[in-house]
Curated annotation (Swiss-Prot):
Cysteine disulfide links: none
Cofactor field: Mg(2+)
One annotated GO biological process: dUTP catabolic process
InterPro entries: dUTPase, dUTPase-like, dUTPase-like_sf, dUTPase_trimeric
Record-listed E.C. numbers: 3.6.1.23
Top-tier EC class: hydrolase
Encoding gene (name): dut
Protein name per Swiss-Prot or TrEMBL: Deoxyuridine 5'-triphosphate nucleotidohydrolase
UniProt lineage: Bacteria, Pseudomonadati, Pseudomonadota, Alphaproteobacteria, Hyphomicrobiales
Species, as recorded: Bradyrhizobium diazoefficiens (strain JCM 10833 / BCRC 13528 / IAM 13628 / NBRC 14792 / USDA 110)
């Protein structure tokens, strides 16, 4: 069973007429975000290029939460289009428009039309660290090994 939190959502003028973000299945983790580009001016994302795509939405998250902007697997698998800074983080105190940085890793140009589902947004609790400076860290079996040090 999932936990529900209240998130205030503001639809900006250029998102009028678009559906609000929605979970596509009962157990979905992410709400689909849509492109709020003009109907008569779709955005063409050439191969190897990236763009900041507007959603026309702003949110107010409850304290202690974040929103993560993540890729949609279908866009990545079928077209090579993904979220460049995945996951993008929306902090609880941010009130600006949610925009998605999409990059086209595919061979062909990709056209983003108004209302196209371009990313998903996952709401998650946040844990803030209390940093404690120390002279040395506790020892572990792994130590400083990284970047494939545990095998393939």
């Amino acid at each position: 069973m999932s936990t529900k939190v209240t998130v205030e959502l503001q639809r900006l003028p250029h998102a009028e007429g678009l559906p609000l973000p929605a979970y596509q299945t009962a157990e979905a983790a992410g709400l689909d975000l849509m492109a709020a580009v003009p109907e008569d001016a779709p955005l063409t994302l050439a191969s190897g290029r990236y763009a900041l795509v507007p959603t026309g939405l702003a949110i107010a998250l409850p304290p202690g939460h974040e929103a993560q902007v993540r890729p949609r697997s279908g866009l990545a698998a079928k077209h090579g289009v993904t979220v460049l800074n995945s996951p993008g983080t929306i902090d609880a105190d941010y009130r600006g428009e949610i925009k998605v940085i999409l990059i086209n890793h595919g061979a062909a140009a990709f056209v983003i039309k108004r209302g196209e589902r371009i990313a998903q947004m996952v709401i998650a609790p946040v844990v803030q660290a209390a940093l404690v400076p120390v002279a040395t860290l506790s020892a572990t079996d792994r130590g400083a090994g990284g970047f494939g040090s545990t095998g393939r």
